């Protein structure tokens, strides 16, 4: 007898599943007999409980398990016979009208959509390019110097020509202060501290606080009003005005290391050669620029593909991906040390738009890969692993680390497939190259 597949909408379908009662009952009896061999009841030795008593206690549970198994098996058989590409999990409901000799259920489900990808020649992609020169290398060296800054107390000799211990604090100095804050003459939690250090101009403190500390000399104090922002993290003081008194305890001026052989050695250049140091920095910047460029271009290609593609997206797949994103968010919170992160009440609805885009892209990419043979080849995967490993001290160990775990390899395979898609689309789309600075590239990739 042919199975009737009802069309309930663009992707929603329904079929009726019929299970002969005698077949179901035979399976129930068989499972109860198997269960009776190990079941325990007061007054009986294990395996000696009368079958009738076992059936009375467990028949309902066993029947539910058998029906669940049989329904799943029958649905799988029907979907194979009718060539149904089922998306997500079906839902099963008993039919209102039941035959005397069979159980009847309705299985409602969604199918994968037909994906229509438009003419790739109409897709438009802007490809960023960047060059790494002396300016980018010098800027990176400046950042590295600032990361290695150390401080000298006022009165010590140094590049500041600091004028001695009575010099006033200025931006860039590390200051150590005592402060007392009150709201309506009442001290509040977190409003008092001793020997509190911070660097002027870094923005760690509220603007009024930094302004008050600027220009103070050691031993001097200043009283000022400070209004906490309405969205301040301390809810007890948010939006309120406090009166602070800050006393300068210590002022230290910053000293950045010179770019010399010792500095080069601190960056891993064993012989301290400055030319080698600059060459290595350039290589690292070029690698980073390539990574960022690829990320930006990939996002543009994906956006272009979505614009020229037509498909309906199965709700079941969107809901599954929403839950996946919720779990990822909880894992992220756990890694940040948030208590009870695994039970955090994160609404799946907040990921609805992101999940729909991810699912839609996945369907489009799958169709494009299948139609154009863009699957990842083993040699491509190995080449990407080798490239990734180059940035580590022991590349061979990184390669072994990748190939020792199938999940990590699968992630790299997915990356290669995406790269194949990007190259394929770029070869057919309208591509405009745009030269951008490394800073602009970094900013754009951070926002992508």
Swiss-Prot record:
Domain of life, per UniProt, equals Bacteria
Q: Where is the PPIase FKBP-type domain?
A: 172-257
InterPro entries of this UniProt entry? PPIase_dom_sf, PPIase_FKBP_dom, Trig_fac, Trigger_fac_C, Trigger_fac_C_sf, Trigger_fac_ribosome-bd_bac, Trigger_fac_ribosome-bd_sf, Trigger_fact/SurA_dom_sf
Gene Ontology cellular-component annotations: cytoplasm
Localization per Swiss-Prot or TrEMBL: Cytoplasm
Catalytic activity reported? [protein]-peptidylproline (omega=180) = [protein]-peptidylproline (omega=0)
Cite a single GO MF annotation. peptidyl-prolyl cis-trans isomerase activity
The alphabetical list of record keywords is: Cell cycle, Cell division, Chaperone, Cytoplasm, Isomerase, Rotamase
Could you say which enzyme class this protein belongs to? isomerase
A Gene Ontology annotation in the biological process aspect, one of them, is: chaperone-mediated protein folding
Supply the EC number(s).
5.2.1.8
> Which coarse location class applies to the principal site listed for this UniProt protein?
cytoplasm
**The keyword Methyltransferase belongs to this UniProt entry's keyword annotation:** no
NCBIfam families, A to Z: tig
The family note in this entry says: Belongs to the FKBP-type PPIase family. Tig subfamily.
Q: What is known of its domains?
A: Consists of 3 domains; the N-terminus binds the ribosome, the middle domain has PPIase activity, while the C-terminus has intrinsic chaperone activity on its own.
Q: What is the stated purpose of this protein? A: Involved in protein export. Acts as a chaperone by maintaining the newly synthesized protein in an open conformation. Functions as a peptidyl-prolyl cis-trans isomerase.
Identification of the protein by name: Trigger factor
Which organism's genome codes for this protein? Burkholderia vietnamiensis (strain G4 / LMG 22486)
- This chain is encoded by the gene named tig
